């Protein structure tokens, strides 16, 4: 690069110096970005269970609809349980994802306070599970693969839900999912809480996002039951083994999907692309099996949960 300039070249010299300055800054910026990626990766490695729970409940974490709409060319939501209810906490529908026509069942939290009130914070009522049951049977009738996205603190436990038969609605979903003869994949994208999560989680392949949680009861509820003190939720979370790594080691889930640096809410587009690739890959493998083989595979998978030898 030229270093000697005549007087009439001064303006060119200034531009060249500015260019060199910007290049140095660009190099520094790239170096800083590399360091930031390393720090971010280290920062989110080995989080405590309570911290994972906070990430799973992050208000900006992508919802089921964010993923479905991001993955599909056209999403058609199917409404109602045909018994007078259309629960907004559990959405159902059909979508075209590349070459696959997929039926989705998904918990849906709100993206803001108003939506959360409409969707009951992602806690389905019996009508929601009856709607899911209706759509499951549609998927089975037409031979369409079923994908469920799980993100709920649990099924709604209010008095009205009990009056409407919450336990029966969940039990019927569980029974039906074991009988379906189509490929079934479940993905825990945020909170997987109690029977409310399990009700749409009987599948051939269970995946879980890196910072999602899956538990028999919320840590707060567990602490209140065991120690009569909800403030001991951190100890309860530790005892429940709610994180993806422990659940993979225990055989409760089959695969962990890594999240982008800084978690899913920092790069929803990248997370959606990753989730889509995983779902399509697993569906391709499951579609090789016959209906009877899929049923047997599902039953065998659940029979081995909690299995141990003394």
Curated annotation (Swiss-Prot):
GO terms for molecular function: acetyl-CoA carboxylase activity; ATP binding; carboxyl- or carbamoyltransferase activity. It is found in: Plastid, Chloroplast. Pfam families: ACCA. It catalyses: N(6)-carboxybiotinyl-L-lysyl-[protein] + acetyl-CoA = N(6)-biotinyl-L-lysyl-[protein] + malonyl-CoA. Its main location: plastid. GO terms for cellular component: acetyl-CoA carboxylase complex; chloroplast. Residues 31-285 form the CoA carboxyltransferase C-terminal domain. GO terms for biological process: fatty acid biosynthetic process; malonyl-CoA biosynthetic process. Pathway: Lipid metabolism; malonyl-CoA biosynthesis; malonyl-CoA from acetyl-CoA: step 1/1. Keywords: ATP-binding, Chloroplast, Fatty acid biosynthesis, Fatty acid metabolism, Lipid biosynthesis, Lipid metabolism, Nucleotide-binding, Plastid, Transferase. Signal peptide: none annotated. Component of the acetyl coenzyme A carboxylase (ACC) complex. First, biotin carboxylase catalyzes the carboxylation of biotin on its carrier protein (BCCP) and then the CO(2) group is transferred by the carboxyltransferase to acetyl-CoA to form malonyl-CoA. Belongs to the AccA family. PANTHER family: ACETYL-COENZYME A CARBOXYLASE CARBOXYL TRANSFERASE SUBUNIT ALPHA, ACETYL-COENZYME A CARBOXYLASE CARBOXYL TRANSFERASE SUBUNIT ALPHA, CHLOROPLASTIC. NCBIfam families: accA, AccA_sub, PRK05724.1. This is Acetyl-coenzyme A carboxylase carboxyl transferase subunit alpha. It comes from Cyanidioschyzon merolae (strain NIES-3377 / 10D).
